[in-house]
Amino acid sequence: MDLVDKRDVLIGDFRPSLGFYGGVRVGVYLDTTEPKHAKIKGFAMETLKRSSKVWLQELRSNLNIFWGTIESEISKNGAASYIFPLQRCIFSFLCASLAGVDASVSPDIAENGWKTINTWLALQVIPTAKLGVVPQPLEEILLHTWPYPSLLIAGNYKKLYNFIDENAGDCLRLGQEEFGLTRDEAIQNLLFVLGFNAYGGFSVFLPSLIGRITGDNSGLQERIRTEVRRVCGSGSDLNFKTVNEMELVKSVVYETLRFSPPVPLQFARARKDFQISSHDAVFEVKKGELLCGYQPLVMRDANVFDEPEEFKPDRYVGETGSELLNYLYWSNGPQTGTPSASNKQCAAKDIVTLTASLLVADLFLRYDTITGDSGSIKAVVKAK
């Protein structure tokens, strides 16, 4: 971190209005040299640590509801669009595990909270994101010309704020008493971690993962099913320890992150003049220049990855495969790195891959086969 500054560069040289966060500069917009950064990152990491007590239970409980919805839709319509049911599942799961709140204590939040976050996220990222819904010149004129005001979502965001304020007392006291945050700072940062980092990240990544598996016709499902059931024996044996023994499951998760990183662009500004080297060249970087890392390009480096344009499910299996984790940068750092209060690596780096692996293992304890793509599921065959 001595070479680059991460101040206000989450999505480049554009920062959404602080009105989206109640006027608070949340942790993601702080550089590591700013005093509040260590406190907020520490709060996020401790919140994740404490959530481990209920993480698996809440994940599987909400997956039960999700898959029940999907099965019902398939029986009625012959197929099920799963994006919105999955987002509702993710929201409910994260409220319970991160904030320690059952979303159902507020019927309005349980029904509409995830929709509010979708709008809140969209208003922040649309000014710089390529959507592809209209021809590019029109997209630039119509969508990328101005920032969107937080006023458009302020009322519904306030409902989420009040929901956390009224129900997440234990988590908020952690931020206040152990990390010296004001209650408002704790609420705004918890909402950002829950809504932007976790919910937003999972909403992008998990459909890619599910789509890879459900759309595969190479025999991958049979291989995963065999591994999961060999390790688990029965559904009651799925836990953090057993899922870590599933080399193929974890490799599929890593390979999906390599192909489809949830945050494809990462930015930083040079603190000083320095040189940056590639395999065959050296580039001069001047102080103050904004640097952009395009992850899909970085993680398809032919000097590192064999056949980088091919999706290889078992790429990370074995000792040789595990060495490639040094070059898996989806989390703003290598998969072998360690998030800390002094760096900007994703605090949930390990819990993201663990959660995705648990989802895959849970899927193949429920079903023998599943057919679909990144947006819909067409058929499931229940485990015999």
UniProtKB/Swiss-Prot annotation:
MF-aspect GO terms: heme binding; iron ion binding; monooxygenase activity; oxidoreductase activity, acting on paired donors, with incorporation or reduction of molecular oxygen
Entry's Gene Ontology cellular component terms: chloroplast envelope
Gene name linked to the record: CYP74B2
Keyword Isomerase belongs to the record: no
Identification of the protein by name: Probable inactive linolenate hydroperoxide lyase
Summary of the tissues where the protein is detected: Expressed in roots, leaves, flowers and siliques.
Keyword Cell membrane applies: no
Family from the record: Belongs to the cytochrome P450 family.
Domain of life: Eukaryota
Keywords attached to this entry: Heme, Iron, Metal-binding
Cofactor: heme
Organism of provenance: Arabidopsis thaliana
A single GO BP: fatty acid metabolic process
Coiled-coil intervals, chain numbering: none
Alphabetical list of InterPro entries matching this protein: Cyt_P450, Cyt_P450_E_grp-IV, Cyt_P450_sf
Binding site for heme: 346
Induction description: By wounding.
